[in-house]
From Swiss-Prot:
Biological process, per Gene Ontology: phospholipid biosynthetic process
Purpose: In vitro does not phosphorylate diacylglycerol, sphingosine, N,N-dimethylsphingosine; threo-dihydrosphingosine, erythro-dihydrosphingosine, C2 ceramide, C6 ceramide, phosphatidylinositol or dimethylsphingosine. The potential in vivo substrate is unknown.
Subunit structure: Homodimer. May interact with the periplasmic chaperone Skp (also known as OmpH); this suggests the protein may be translocated to the periplasm and then sorted to the outer membrane.
UniProt cross-references to HAMAP family, sorted A to Z: YegS
Binding site for Ca(2+) 2: 242-243, 245, 248
InterPro entries: ATP-NAD_kinase_N, Diacylglycerol/lipid_kinase, Diacylglycerol_kinase_cat_dom, Lip_kinase_YegS, Lipid_Phosphate_FormReg, NAD/diacylglycerol_kinase_sf, YegS/DAGK_C
Organism field: Salmonella typhimurium (strain LT2 / SGSC1412 / ATCC 700720)
Span of domain DAGKc: 2-133
UniProt GO molecular function: ATP binding; lipid kinase activity; magnesium ion binding
Cofactor annotation comment: Binds 1 Mg(2+) ion per subunit. Ca(2+) may be able to substitute. 2 Ca(2+) ions are seen in the crystal structure; one of the two occupies the same site as Mg(2+) in other family members.
SMART domains per the UniProt record, alphabetical: DAGKc
UniProt-annotated binding residues for ATP: 40, 66-72, 95
Protein name in UniProt: Probable lipid kinase YegS
The protein's Enzyme Commission number: 2.7.1.-
Length: 299
């Protein structure tokens, strides 16, 4: 792999003392691969490190962390307007790793690193909310959002993605739907939603397949709404198929407009955004990402 160009790894501070990662990087450096490592400490670090990556001339910026880290790095990359932006590499080190998991990124650190450095760079979509905030994986609203934002950090650290399910079951007594209206291309729905998923990717909340048919290079966002009493399918990986369940509503569009009579909260790759009006649109081919050749999220 010695002929591959340099990469810069932006590592979430929580993983700074990851000894297996240190060993994997050392082995690759011994093979002649140049890998710069930068550790995030506060919001805005990812943007600064992407700027540094441009100055260094690296061809890949690797996001080492969970969905939030991937979001920060990818958002910084798509803001590059002059010249060709570095490709995005994925190194899943977070609690849930929903985007990387659904994209087929290897769990083994050495294999994930090699893919992030040497894999084929494919153009993929991102999404933007209210012309400001971006997400690469999914926007979720309703009860599921409250669970993912309220799950204690110690529980997530101990149990990983399963912690969301356990905390959700503990909070079943607080279950209330969000009334809203959603419009898209050839789509209109109004009612009470327990869970809303608008996906560029397929899963959120620690492995829940909220948008099981979503693709990251089709120029569309997938929508899934859970209504009525159908919370459990959202928590248990959608046990019932949407084609025979009237309480699961699906849609696809390049954009969605959401209006609510009261404030609701969406979780964008782990970051909450509250309001009553949301305009969500896809950004086709917004960045290049190094993915496995059999990535299930590609058409």
């Amino acid at each position: 792999m010695a002929n591959f160009p340099a990469s810069l790894l932006i590592l979430n501070g929580k993983s700074a003392d990851n000894q297996p990662l240190r060993e994997a990087i050392t082995l690759l450096r011994d093979e002649g691969i140049q890998i710069h490592v930068r550790v995030t400490w506060e919001k805005g670090d990812a943007q600064r490190y992407v700027d540094e990556a441009r100055r260094l001339g690296v061809e890949t910026v690797i996001a080492g962390g969970g969905d939030g880290t991937i979001n920060e790095v990818s958002t910084a990359l798509i803001q590059i307007r002059d010249g060709v932006a570095p490709a995005l590499g994925l190194l899943p080190l977070g609690t849930a790793n929903d985007f990387a998991t659904s994209a087929g990124i290897p769990e083994a650190l050495d294999k994930a690193l090699k893919l992030a450095i040497a894999g084929n760079a494919m153009e993929i979509d991102m999404a933007m909310v209210n012309d400001k905030t971006c997400f690469i994986n999914m926007a979720t609203g309703g009860f599921g959002t409250r669970i993912t934002t309220e799950t204690p950090e110690k529980l997530k650290a101990a149990l990983g993605g399963v912690s969301y399910l356990i905390h959700g079951l503990m909070r079943m007594d607080t279950l209330t739907p969000d009334r809203c209206e959603i419009r898209g291309e050839n789509f209109h729905w109004q009612g009470d939603a327990l869970v809303i998923g608008i996906g560029n990717g397929r899963q959120a909340g620690g492995g829940q397949q909220l948008c099981p048919t979503a693709l990251i290079n089709d120029g569309l966002l997938q929508l899934r709404i859970f209504t009525g009493e159908e919370l459990l399918p959202a928590l248990f990986s959608t046990l019932t198929q949407s084609d025979d369940n009237p309480n699961i509503i699906d849609g696809a569009s390049a954009w969605f407009d959401i209006h609510a009579p009261h404030e609701i909260t969406f979780n964008l790759d782990g970051e909450p955004l509250s309001g009553q009006e949301f305009h969500i649109e896809v950004l086709p081919g917004a960045l290049r990402c190094r993915l496995p050749p059999d990535c299930p999220l590609l058409r």
